[in-house]
Amino acid sequence: ELLALPLSKGVWKLGELPNRRCSYIMDGKTEVVLAHDFSGGDRQSGVSFQAVTATRGGTALPAVSVHPPYRGGTGEAVVSYRLQLPAGEPAVFQAQTAIRDHDPKTEPASDGVEFVVAVATADDAAPARLFSRFSDSKVWEPVAVDLSAYAGKEIVLSLLAGPGPARNTTCDSAFWGVPTVVVGVQPQPLSEEAWREREEQAIALARQAAVGKRGAGAFTLRGEAGQYGAAIIPGDEGMV
């Protein structure tokens, strides 16, 4: 049984959490749970799970590599996490999805993989499928699912990868890139213009400090090379 991991405000990369569960659902029937923290391929079903670094479209990301089951039927590969979301905070699930390359000389192309994000609580008769995309993209495609309705609740968040409507599992190795839950309102990234403005302010303060005129956040330093200046311009959130 998965233990619930209480989340606080911040960015939680699911691939770094210890409470992952791997399973598969064959032909829409009962879920089959594999050994705790399973990694590799399952001989009976053909389903596979592995933590990898996947490069798609020139961008390398830590990812969970999966292949849907295909022996004795077809179905969905499922990676699940039990999470306790804090009350009063917004939350969103974010990830990137893609499938692997194939060798056209030796194997046919995948017709696509169906990526699904599902959430279940103790009150639900069945998991709610909040996101679904059937795709054969070999470059990263973003996923964003609002989890704010589950604030204050314990949930099982499941990432499913299946063969899609044709039930064709050929070359269906797929990736969940950097699956993440973001809790709370996060600072907005600075624009390039704002970064340049802060850089110019810091350089100006450092130059003044180099000649002994120290302002707030500026320092006059001395070493074997002589006297020089340094400066710090903190952001809206302070310094990290």
Q: What spans do the regions from the language model cover?
A:
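Gly-Asp-aromatic-enriched flexible segments
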Residues: 1-240
